[in-house]
């Protein structure tokens, strides 16, 4: 596999993590609940999926357990923010710290373990032909099942939110919970549902990370991807289709820094300005420097959101971060 094909394949793998986590955060925020605990939910999903796969040898069962672990931690966030009306930011950060601590403690004995996770696969019948397409064949038509599921999730989430009664009611809860309640929509129930579904997506992202992307467990292996997923929701302006674009953009940056050690862009020493450009290129392509690119891009995205305040204000759910107090007659 050429460097370019390998880079694209790694981009797909890295983008899947961000896409799943970002879609889950989007659903939660559409209901008016900010979830900053995505990082912690991804970690418990990664560890839960890895342990079950290591014990049973069944990576699908491990993937399901990873989803369940993310949903369990999300249920705690929902209880704190919806029932107890706690500050959503504080609750989310606390759950990220909790998830990090729990997985570091309980996962310490699994660091040296190896598993057989999701294998790369091709589409039935046509896949064996598509995989031979130049450049994109190896990247997009020989991936893991979770990569395909993440791509499928984009139109599914779009249809769920904008074409189903349940999705439209969730959006209504995030825009104007008082009016939704007046129309008979169970605000608390749907907010719980959205947050827990979002946690399931985060758990799936973590399970993909440990069962497909790396097929190993390392404490803190999400390395900030949960925070990037939260920023991606702003980048996407709460739209699933734009989430796909953002996930692949950040996935490319993530993959580029992972594969930068095998890349050489040195100019011919006799070329003009080679003495100036070679040190600059070597610095920019340094793996330690490149590891900061996804996070620098995240800062740039959030800065752009601040500059484009009006467009973001129009896109953000009106009741985001707002607790709902139902008035009793």
Swiss-Prot record:
Q: Which residues form a coiled coil?
A: none
* A single cellular component GO annotation: plasma membrane
Example of a GO MF term? transmembrane transporter activity
Q: Which keywords label this protein? A: Cell membrane, Membrane, Plasmid, Sugar transport, Transmembrane, Transmembrane helix, Transport
Is the keyword Transmembrane assigned to this protein? yes
Segments passing through the bilayer? 3-23, 32-52, 60-80, 89-109, 139-161, 193-213, 216-236
Q: How does it sit in the membrane?
A: Multi-pass membrane protein
Q: Does the keyword Glycosyltransferase apply?
A: no
| Compartments where located | Cell membrane
User: What interactions and quaternary structure are annotated?
Assistant: The complex is composed of two ATP-binding proteins (TsgD13), two transmembrane proteins (TsgB13 and TsgC13) and a solute-binding protein (TsgA13).
Main function: Part of an ABC transporter complex involved in glucose import (Potential). Responsible for the translocation of the substrate across the membrane.
Q: So what family is this one in?
A: Belongs to the binding-protein-dependent transport system permease family.
> What name is this protein filed under?
Putative glucose ABC transporter permease protein TsgC13
Organism of this sequence: Haloferax volcanii (strain ATCC 29605 / DSM 3757 / JCM 8879 / NBRC 14742 / NCIMB 2012 / VKM B-1768 / DS2)
- Gene symbol of the encoding locus: tsgC13
